[in-house]
């Protein structure tokens, strides 16, 4: 089925009005993207709080209409619905259904991290390398709201877990994924040989997503999720926290207490330039602190002092 697609730019402040107008005149679907994606001004949106829908400062908004829609009539209807909005920047084009679906799916290709960790969307066949007997494959849905491996903060943690497995430090261990989101890191740890994973997140939606992904990946028996108040008080040989730098600072004492003596921690969600203060903060409890960079993002790792 073909469609008529309208694409325009808007701001976070005006987005609700644009979307409301588009839906009123019959848009079948509306998609929002970062207008600065793949540029130095790209904004990372990490996991939202409960009831929040964070957006970028500037967005590209795409709306689909039936193919037989008249572009001029649509534009007139939009201008009549909300004449204060600028509709002049909008552009129309005809798209085929398979083009739209292909463009969407092409954004989410199988991704390899380290020597044998793979994140593969459910709608893709396993690449040949991911079919190896020792491949650690996590399957996720495209566009997952809580982390799919495409962001450098997640990639940094996945590569760290993969290296732990290479070094023989993950096999049979218990792992804490603090701020688990989709559960991607905990699931990767399980696929790499960890015995059990605990996911903690302050968003109930994230816990639902993690539990669902664990079940779909056949790991529901070894994956346990908790809100912070319900988290069992325990120590772990492996702890990973992919949250924000401000949260890593505020939770430093708690996270340090979760790492067993001689255990390892990875901290991510840190912008380049923020790592200095965190290195000093965590030096109270950790040795061998190291910072690793991926683009604008940093990962800090360390070994818990006895």
UniProtKB/Swiss-Prot annotation:
Any one cellular-component term (Gene Ontology): cytosol
MF-aspect GO terms: protein-lysine N-methyltransferase activity
Keyword Phosphoprotein recorded: no
SUPFAM superfamilies: S-adenosyl-L-methionine-dependent methyltransferases
Reactions accelerated catalytically: L-lysyl-[protein] + 3 S-adenosyl-L-methionine = N(6),N(6),N(6)-trimethyl-L-lysyl-[protein] + 3 S-adenosyl-L-homocysteine + 3 H(+)
Keyword DNA-binding: no
InterPro entries: Ribosomal_L11_MeTrfase_PrmA, Ribosomal_PrmA_MeTrfase, SAM-dependent_MTases_sf
Binding residue positions for S-adenosyl-L-methionine: 154, 179, 201, 242
Compartments reported by the entry: Cytoplasm
Pfam families, alphabetized: PrmA (PF06325)
EC number: 2.1.1.-
One example of a Gene Ontology biological process annotation: methylation
Top-rank taxon: Bacteria
Record's keyword terms, sorted: Cytoplasm, Methyltransferase, S-adenosyl-L-methionine, Transferase
HAMAP family linked: Methyltr_PrmA (MF_00735)
Protein family membership: Belongs to the methyltransferase superfamily. PrmA family.
Role according to the record: Methylates ribosomal protein L11.
Name this protein carries in UniProt: Ribosomal protein L11 methyltransferase
Taxonomic lineage: Bacteria, Pseudomonadati, Pseudomonadota, Gammaproteobacteria, Lysobacterales
């Amino acid at each position: 089925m073909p469609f008529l697609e309208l694409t325009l730019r808007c701001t976070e402040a005006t987005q609700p009005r644009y979307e409301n107008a588009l839906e009123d005149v019959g848009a079948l679907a509306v998609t929002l993207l970062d207008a600065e994606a793949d540029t130095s001004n790209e904004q990372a949106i990490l996991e939202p709080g409960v009831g929040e829908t964070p957006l970028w400062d500037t967005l590209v908004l795409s709306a689909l209409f039936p193919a037989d829609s008249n572009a001029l009539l649509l534009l007139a209807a939009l201008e009549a619905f909300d004449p204060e909005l600028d509709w002049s920047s909008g552009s129309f084009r005809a798209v085929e259904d398979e083009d739209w679906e292909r463009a969407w799916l092409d954004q989410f290709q199988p991704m390899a991290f380290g020597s044998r960790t793979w994140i593969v969307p459910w709608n893709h066949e396993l690449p040949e390398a991911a079919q190896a007997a020792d491949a650690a494959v996590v399957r996720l849905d495209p566009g997952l709201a809580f982390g799919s491996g495409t962001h450098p903060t997640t990639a940094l943690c996945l590569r760290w877990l993969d290296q732990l497995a290479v070094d023989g430090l993950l096999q049979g261990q218990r792992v804490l994924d603090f701020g688990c989101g989709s559960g991607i890191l905990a699931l990767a740890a399980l696929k790499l040989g960890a015995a059990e994973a605990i996911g903690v997140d302050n968003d109930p939606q994230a816990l639902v997503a993690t539990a669902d992904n664990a079940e779909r990946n056949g790991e529901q028996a070894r994956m346990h999720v908790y809100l912070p108040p319900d988290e069992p008080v325990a120590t772990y040989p492996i702890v990973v926290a992919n949250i924000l730098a401000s949260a890593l600072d505020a939770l430093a004492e708690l996270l340090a207490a979760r790492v067993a003596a001689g255990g390892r921690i990875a901290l991510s969600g840190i912008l380049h330039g923020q790592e200095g203060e965190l290195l000093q903060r965590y030096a109270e409890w950790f040795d061998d602190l190291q910072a690793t960079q991926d683009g604008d993002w940093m990962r800090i790792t360390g070994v818990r002092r006895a």
